[in-house]
Amino acid sequence: MKAHFGVTVWLGVCCSMTLLMVVIGGITRLTHSGLSITEWQPIVGVVPPIGDEAWLREKEKYAQTPEYRHRAADISLDDFKRIYIIEYIHRLFGRALGAVFCLPIPYFAITKRIDRAMVAKLLIVALLGGMQGAMGWFMVKSGLVDTPRVSHYRLAGHLFLTILLFSILWHSFLRCAGVRSTTTTTNARFFTAAAVVGLTVLQMVLGALVAGLDAGLTYNTFPLMDGAIIPQSLFSAKLWHGGFLHDVTAVQFLHRLVAVLIVVCAAPLPFWLKTRGAWLFLACVALQFLLGVATLVSVVHIFLAAMHQVFGFVTLAAGVHMLCRLRREGSTCISGHAGIS
C-alpha cells in the first residue's frame, strides 16, 4: 500500500525536531543551565518571567539550590537570565515537540492514513515522550537537594528514553519512506550487525555517564590515560567493590574501550553485508569516534561536545537504516509501507 505523503513528512519532522532537541539539551547541560528553573510547571511554565520583579523571584528560588551555593553565588541577574533562557527554550521546545507529534495522530487515525498497528506504535512513542519529560524533571530534582549536579544515572536514563523514542520514530519514518528489506544475508551476519548497533546504544548511555560525572574534563589525551593505555587506578581494590560506575577514571576508560570495540566490529560490516547502508554506518562510526577524541582533547569544547552528542543519534540512525535494508535468510521481504493505509 502506498504511504501517505503527509504521514511521511510528519514523521520526518518529528525525527528532525528530536535531533534538534538533543542539541538543545546538550547545550543546556554544557552551559550549566539545567538547574536554573527549580519548578516543573508544564502549563504555567510556558510563560517566562516578565519584568525585573519576576526575574528576581526566580533568581531567589535559584539561590536556594546547591549549585548556586557552590558554583554561582556571585552570579549577576543578567547572567542568571542567560542560563534561565537556555533552560526555558529547552523545556518549551520539548512541549512543542510533544504537540507536533501528538496532535496529528487522531486525524491520521480517523482518516485511515495509519492503521491500528501504527497507531499503537505511535502511542508507545507518545508514552515514552511523557516518561522522558518526567525523567527529565526527576533528573533535575537530583541536583536541587544536596549536590550541585544531577545524578549521572538519571541523566543516562533520560538519554536512554530519548534513544528508544527516536529509534521507533526513525524506523517508522523509514518504513513510510519506502525503505525495504531487500538485501539477503545470513543470520550470523544480521545479528552481528544488530549487535554493533546495540553497542552503539550502550556507548551513548556510557557517554551520558561520562557527561554526568564531568569525566571528560580529566585525562584529556588519547590514546593514553595518565601515560598508560590502562591507568593504574583501575586496579584499585576499592574501585571493584561497588564504586566502578561512580569513578571518573573507570567510566571514561569504559567509554574509550567501547568506542574502539565499535570501530573494530563495524569495520568488516560493509564487506560482509555489501550494502551502501553498511558503508554509511561505518563512515558515521568513524566520524563519531574522531568527534569523541576531539571533544576529549579540547577539554569538552561546547560546540564539539554538542556535535558529539547529536552525532551519536545520527550514527544510530545510520545503524537502524542499515538493519532495515537487511533480510535474513528464509524470512520474507518486509514492505516499506507497513502500517500505512
From Swiss-Prot:
* UniProt key word Nucleotidyltransferase: no
What keywords is this UniProt entry annotated with?
Answer: Cell membrane, Heme biosynthesis, Iron, Membrane, Metal-binding, Oxidoreductase, Transmembrane, Transmembrane helix
Primary residence: membrane
Could you tell me the EC number(s) of this protein? 1.17.99.9
Which cofactors go with this protein? heme b
Give the GO biological process terms: heme A biosynthetic process
Pathway named in the protein's UniProt entry: Porphyrin-containing compound metabolism; heme A biosynthesis; heme A from heme O: step 1/1
Matching Pfam families: COX15-CtaA
- DNA-binding as a keyword of this entry, yes or no, is no
State the compartments where it is located.
Cell membrane
**Which GO CC annotations does the UniProt entry carry?**
plasma membrane
**Membrane-spanning residues where?**
7-27, 92-112, 118-138, 159-179, 190-210, 253-273, 280-300, 302-322
Instruction: Please write the reaction equations for the catalytic activity of this protein.
Output: Fe(II)-heme o + 2 A + H2O = Fe(II)-heme a + 2 AH2
Q: Which family does it belong to?
A: Belongs to the COX15/CtaA family. Type 2 subfamily.
Q: What does this protein do?
A: Catalyzes the conversion of heme O to heme A by two successive hydroxylations of the methyl group at C8. The first hydroxylation forms heme I, the second hydroxylation results in an unstable dihydroxymethyl group, which spontaneously dehydrates, resulting in the formyl group of heme A.
Q: How does it assemble?
A: Interacts with CtaB.
Which PANTHER family does the UniProt entry name for this protein?
CYTOCHROME C OXIDASE ASSEMBLY PROTEIN COX15, CYTOCHROME C OXIDASE ASSEMBLY PROTEIN COX15 HOMOLOG
Could you identify this protein by its name? Heme A synthase
Q: Which organism is this entry from?
A: Anaplasma marginale (strain St. Maries)
Originating gene: ctaA
